């Protein structure tokens, strides 16, 4: 530090200090005449800077005798201690050691921000590689191979579970339906007429018709499905119409209709009550609520594809299968279909595009037919068979779909796995720290002296990095450092640049005065 102060005290001097590189400074006598050379000695405790080219002082070009030059620019001193430039004065940028450059403050800030982001990212996302034990630990502890085997098994298990989850997600995109039997019960009761002698008023004879139903229990259902809430009877239908005998109830009162709306509340059955004391023939029309919607095919297309009622995607898929089986695709223009005699009769065209098929199918698809049940409402008190049962096929959501959804949405197991993974990462990190401590102590035990020297060198490098010190202060404080080949060229370039700068300033000043 004393040597550093000595250089800084010499650098800011004027003309005498600037020529210190020649080995001596010329003292100016009265009138500006050069006096005898005066040797500048170092301050107490300071080292003396000696130039590699000793010689007498020489006048600077472009300066009058006796004049003094004021210092310009940064102070001159040893590299790394004087001024702010990141390179030595007069030394080309390419000749500077890249490792000795001081990074700009903006670059340092960017590097620090990037490091913080990387640490946060690594803290949030643990990699599979963090669970792997280093090879050195596996050599020291042979029993750790069992852990590596478990890790490989876990990797395979994770891959299998992930593949299964993807399969389930793809399956949920398609409608998963299963066919069940819906049993419909149609019953009626008769209330005979009653007379009231007291007030002369009585009740007329009437009957009541009930339409209800339920799903038949399937022996293959699980306990989960058995305890599940039962669907209401009306949820299976889009509309229900009961048509009574028009001759008995007239054209305005012979129809009883129910249609589903957005605000419809589901019910377990329907009942109709009308006056009457004779048997009534009625027709029950039930329109199933298909989800997704299904359509009835044109009879010609139904015979060709072997489908009576189906969803639109299934119909298009069946038609494409027919085209592919009979090789009806145009070999030259693949977007066209060459219709055979059956397709020509149905679509009334010899050639059509694939993109036209959905539009052409629209005219061939009709609403599905309703379920028609004919029933006789009996008012005979001796008739014991007043309840009729009918079984129809309905499509309900597969119970497996609910289990699939619950499997995908369940997070309890994921949280438990994440907790165990964190424990594994902490354990592996502790093992790595213990391994580092073991290697540290083992190296010290083998060669204490060499280990201490290497450790001090490493700590010195870390200290320089932490304190942002550029260069090697231990070398730069010695005079031999400045007897290297670069010093002479650096000094000459520095003086030349200062002279050129001063000359330009003088020329500008003289030019202003002349004008």
Curated annotation (Swiss-Prot):
Q: Which residues form a coiled coil?
A: 412-440
User: Which of the residues bear the PTM Asymmetric dimethylarginine?
Assistant: 68, 88
Annotated crosslink Glycyl lysine isopeptide (Lys-Gly) (interchain with G-Cter in SUMO2) location: 101
The ranges of region (Interaction with ESR1, NR1H4, NR3C1, PGR and SMARCA4) come to: 43-167
**Which residues does the record list as N6-acetyllysine (modified residue)?**
223
Where the record annotates domain SWIB/MDM2, the positions are: 290-367
GO biological-process terms attached to the record: cellular response to fatty acid; chromatin remodeling; negative regulation of cell differentiation; nervous system development; nucleosome disassembly; positive regulation of cell differentiation; positive regulation of cell population proliferation; positive regulation of double-strand break repair
Q: Give, from the UniProt record, the effect of changing residue 495 to L.
A: In CSS11; does not affect the interaction with SMARCC1 and SMARCA4
Q: Which GO terms describe its cellular component?
A: brahma complex; chromatin; GBAF complex; intracellular membrane-bounded organelle; kinetochore; nBAF complex; npBAF complex; nuclear matrix
Which residue intervals make up region (Disordered)? 1-103
GO terms (molecular function) for this protein are: chromatin binding; molecular adaptor activity; signaling receptor binding; transcription coactivator activity; transcription coregulator activity
What tissues is it present in? Expressed in all tissues tested, including brain, heart, kidney, liver, lung, muscle, pancreas and placenta.
- For bias type Gly residues, the affected ranges are 14-23
**Which region ranges are annotated with the description Interaction with SMARCC1 and SMARCC2?**
168-474
According to its UniProt record, which protein family does this protein belong to? Belongs to the SMARCD family.
This chain's function reads: Involved in transcriptional activation and repression of select genes by chromatin remodeling (alteration of DNA-nucleosome topology). Component of SWI/SNF chromatin remodeling complexes that carry out key enzymatic activities, changing chromatin structure by altering DNA-histone contacts within a nucleosome in an ATP-dependent manner. Belongs to the neural progenitors-specific chromatin remodeling complex (npBAF complex) and the neuron-specific chromatin remodeling complex (nBAF complex).
Disease cited in the entry: Coffin-Siris syndrome 11: A form of Coffin-Siris syndrome, a congenital multiple malformation syndrome with broad phenotypic and genetic variability. Cardinal features are intellectual disability, coarse facial features, hypertrichosis, and hypoplastic or absent fifth digit nails or phalanges. Additional features include malformations of the cardiac, gastrointestinal, genitourinary, and/or central nervous systems. Sucking/feeding difficulties, poor growth, ophthalmologic abnormalities, hearing impairment, and spinal anomalies are common findings.
Please give the name of this protein: SWI/SNF-related matrix-associated actin-dependent regulator of chromatin subfamily D member 1
* Originating species: Homo sapiens
């Amino acid at each position: 530090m004393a040597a550093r102060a000595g250089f800084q005290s010499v650098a800011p001097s004027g003309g005498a200090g600037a020529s210190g590189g020649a080995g001596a400074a010329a003292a100016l006598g009265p009138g500006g005449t050069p006096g005898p050379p005066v040797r500048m000695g170092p301050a107490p405790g300071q080292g003396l800077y000696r130039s590699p080219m000793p010689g007498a002082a020489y006048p600077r070009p472009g300066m009058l005798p006796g004049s003094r030059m004021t210092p310009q620019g940064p102070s001159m001193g040893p590299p790394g201690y004087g001024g702010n430039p990141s390179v030595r004065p007069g030394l080309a940028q390419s000749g500077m050691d890249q490792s000795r450059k001081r990074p700009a403050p903006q670059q340092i800030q960017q590097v620090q921000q990037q490091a913080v982001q990387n640490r946060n990212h690594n803290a949030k996302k643990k990699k599979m590689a963090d669970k792997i034990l280093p090879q050195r630990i596996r050599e020291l502890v042979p029993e750790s191979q069992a852990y590596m085997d478990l890790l490989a098994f876990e990797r395979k298990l994770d891959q299998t579970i992930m593949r299964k989850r993807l399969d389930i997600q793809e399956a949920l995109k398609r409608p998963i339906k299963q066919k069940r039997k819906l049993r419909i019960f149609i019953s009626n009761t008769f209330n005979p007429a009653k007379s009231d002698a007291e007030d002369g008023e009585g009740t007329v004879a009437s009957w009541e018709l009930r339409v209800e139903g339920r799903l038949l229990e399937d022996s293959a259902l699980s306990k989960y499905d058995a305890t599940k809430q039962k669907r209401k009877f009306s949820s299976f239908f889009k509309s229900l119409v009961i048509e009574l005998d028009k001759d008995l109830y007239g054209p305005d009162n012979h129809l009883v209709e129910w249609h589903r709306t957005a605000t419809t509340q589901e019910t377990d059955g329907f009942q109709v009550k009308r006056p009457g004391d004779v048997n009534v023939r009625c027709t029950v029309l039930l329109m199933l609520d298909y989800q997704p919607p299904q359509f009835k095919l044109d009879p010609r297309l139904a015979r060709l594809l072997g489908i009576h009622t189906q969803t639109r995607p299934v119909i298009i898929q069946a038609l494409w299968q027919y085209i592919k089986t009979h090789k009806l695709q145009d070999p030259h223009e693949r977007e066209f279909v060459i219709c055979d005699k059956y397709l020509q009769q149905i679509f009334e065209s010899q050639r059509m595009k694939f993109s036209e098929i959905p539009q052409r199918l629209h005219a061939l698809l009709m609403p599905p037919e309703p379920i028609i049940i004919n029933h006789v409402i009996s008012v005979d008190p001796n008739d014991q068979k007043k309840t009729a049962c009918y079984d129809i096929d309905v499509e309900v959501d597969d119970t497996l779909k609910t289990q699939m959804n619950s499997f995908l949405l369940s997070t309890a197991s994921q949280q438990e796995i994440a907790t165990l993974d964190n424990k594994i990462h902490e354990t592996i990190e502790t093992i790595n720290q213990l391994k580092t401590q073991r290697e540290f102590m083992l190296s010290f035990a083998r060669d204490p002296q060499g280990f201490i020297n290497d450790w001090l060198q490493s700590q010195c490098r870390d200290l320089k990095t932490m304190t942002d010190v550029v260069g090697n202060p231990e070398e730069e404080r010695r005079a031999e450092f400045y007897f290297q080949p670069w010093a002479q060229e650096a000094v000459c370039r520095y003086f030349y640049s200062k002279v050129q700068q001063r000359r330009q300033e003088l020329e500008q000043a003289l030019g202003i005065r002349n004008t």
